[in-house]
A protein has these predicted regions:
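Membrane-embedded helix-loop-helix hairpins and adjacent transmembrane boundary segments
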Residues: 1-550
Length: 550
């Protein structure tokens, strides 16, 4: 069974009509930049947690994680077990962000360090969104259409590009008009549909396969092992143990795309509990997306599923295995997830450009002008993301691995600057700027050399070409560890050899400079239930690590 039937299209249409209603209801009041970029700072814990999950579980998860599961097994689950990073966000960093009253992460860096650090992070973040998240999400949207509607063609344009452009245009429209409030409330709805739909795929896939025991037997112990040998070219255990947390802490604790939801919380308690709820949800992709990919691999081995390439695992199972009607609901959730991820990106890009760049250039701009500029910035990001899609296919054979490799080159300097800045009051602006500049330069150089190595001939290279190829061929996880250590050393050395930051500048921005009132506010924002749920999340993560040992 392939394609969609009339009932499927009816379900998809009804689902998007409901989404449109949610967007309309949530976007009627957009009077100020705080309303547009931070939803009026009045969001509760459930919506925050659901939005954290839906924004993270975009196309790169629906398509990329299932693809990795189909090709390599459970190894990519390391990234999905980063639910503990959300606990770090809620307990460690959110109190500083919330008390600072900032709109963006670069704005926090300016408060902690200096304006130069803010400029650097703003520009690099915008570029990173285009070259990783936006392009990957758009690419995955095209892959979904390619599988579900393989024969669709308009004026010589195939279904891949029709799908990619359609997802971008529709998402751009509702993001521009709805702002963050529309984004987070549609995220909450999409979270429910995503979980239910993905559970259907997992359950039906296991039913056709013959159960969990059959999956284990066909997959073998290696595919059920989170810990690969140190010599593994894709997932060496030292890299997964030490590098993956570096990327996870950057993404979940310092990335505007994620943290913006907590900045919109009604109060500090709602922000932290939103991260706790998000941590529970974050564990589910191991079973909702990676395991279906492994099921797809097993079904292919039994000649029960037709699969062109690993990245088609999830949409192929939707198209070929789900019954009519249910298939339409899951497809609606699948496409909505693509749009949810993109809408979050567009809103974050708007916030970064408007608050950190345009507002610095035009400080007298009115609230209406700020919202208009943010909407215009969305259009530019859309075009750049579409242009980058052909390039990214040369970097890595798998969608999700591409995203992780690029993030591994950009995360180390940001992780070092944020965490050392909060834990050590001696870190200063000069150290932060030096770390960001050198770290980003080395990371982008690695990306460039990796692209070059992918197209370089096998023989006849000069000495310089061989150096570039060797640098580009370093495993991205191991490179992430080396770069992080270099960035930490740079930040510490430059800071210690220059003047410390003024005491007034870092008040309530580091643990050592917290005021009595600040400590009291944090203590009053949690109780024993927050502790209990934190422990439960950690125990679940530990249990998954113990089970998936081959």
């Amino acid at each position: 069974m392939t394609g969609l039937d009339a009932l499927d299209w009816l379900v998809v249409g009804a689902y998007f009509a409901l989404l449109a209603f949610v967007v309309w209801r949530s976007s009627r009041k957009q009077e100020t930049s705080a309303d547009y970029f931070l939803a009026g700072r009045n969001i509760g814990w459930f919506v925050i947690g659901a939005s954290l999950f839906a924004s993270n579980i975009g196309s790169e998860h629906l398509v990329g994680l299932a693809g990795s599961g189909a090709k390599s097994g459970v190894a990519m689950a390391h990234y999905e077990l980063h639910a503990w990073c959300l606990l770090v966000l809620g307990w460690v960093l959110v109190p500083f962000y919330y008390r600072a009253g900032v709109y963006t992460m670069p704005e926090f860096l300016e408060r902690r360090y200096n304006p130069t650090a803010r400029w650097i992070l703003s520009l690099v973040s915008l570029l990173a969104y285009v070259f990783t998240k936006v392009s990957v999400t758009v690419y995955a949207g095209g892959k979904v259409f390619e599988v579900l509607l393989p024969d669709l063609e308009i004026a010589g344009v195939n279904s891949f590009w029709i799908g990619a452009v359609t997802v971008v245009v529709l998402t751009g429209i509702y993001t521009c008009f709805g702002g963050l409030r529309a984004v987070v409330y549609t995220d909450a709805l999409q979270t429910v549909v995503l979980i239910l739909g993905s559970l259907c795929i997992t359950a039906i896939g296991l039913y056709h396969l013959g159960g969990w025991a059959e999956l284990r037997e066909i997959s073998g112990s290696e595919r059920f092992n989170l810990w690969r040998p140190a010599s593994d070219p894709e997932f060496p255990w030292p890299g997964m143990l030490f590098a993956a947390p570096i990327v996870g802490l950057w993404y979940w604790c310092t990335d505007q795309y994620i943290v913006q939801r907590t900045l919109a919380a009604r109060n500090l308690k709602m922000a932290r509990r939103g991260t706790l709820f998000g941590a529970y949800l974050k564990i589910t992709p191991v079973f909702l997306f990676i395991v279906p990919g492994m099921i797809a691999y097993a079904l292919v081995q039994k000649n029960m599923l037709v699969l062109g390439d690993p990245d088609q695992a999830f949409p192929a199972m939707v198209s070929q295995m789900l019954p009519v009607g249910v298939r339409g609901l899951v497809v609606g959730g699948l496409l909505a997830a693509l749009m949810s991820s993109l809408s979050s990106l567009f809103n974050s890009c708007s916030s970064l450009f408007t608050v950190d760049i345009y507002k610095k250039i035009a400080p007298e701009a009115s609230e209406r002008q700020l919202v208009s500029v943010g909407r215009l910035a969305t259009g530019v990001v859309i075009v750049l993301g579409l242009l980058w899609i052909p390039v990214m296919q040369r970097v890595s054979g798998q969608l999700y691995e591409y995203l992780q490799s690029v993030q591994a080159y950009l995360a180390p300097p940001m992780t070092a600057v944020f965490f050392l800045g909060v834990f050590w009051k001696r870190m200063n602006g000069r150290g932060a700027v030096a770390t960001l500049v050198l770290g980003f330069f080395l990371g982008l150089a690695k990306l460039g050399c990796q692209i070059y190595a992918g197209s370089a001939p096998e023989g006849g290279l000069s000495a310089m070409q061989q150096v570039l190829v060797s640098y580009g061929s370093i495993n991205f996880l191991l490179f992430c560890v080396y770069l992080f250590l270099f960035c930490c050393a740079t930040l510490v050395a430059v800071s210690l050899f220059s003047a410390p930051p003024p005491a007034g500048q870092i008040e309530n921005l580091t643990y050592a400079t917290n005021t009595t009132a600040g400590r009291r506010e944090v203590r009053e924002s949690w109780n024993r239930w927050d502790i209990i749920h934190t422990v439960i999340v950690l125990l679940i993560i530990l249990s998954v690590y113990v089970y998936f040992r081959g």
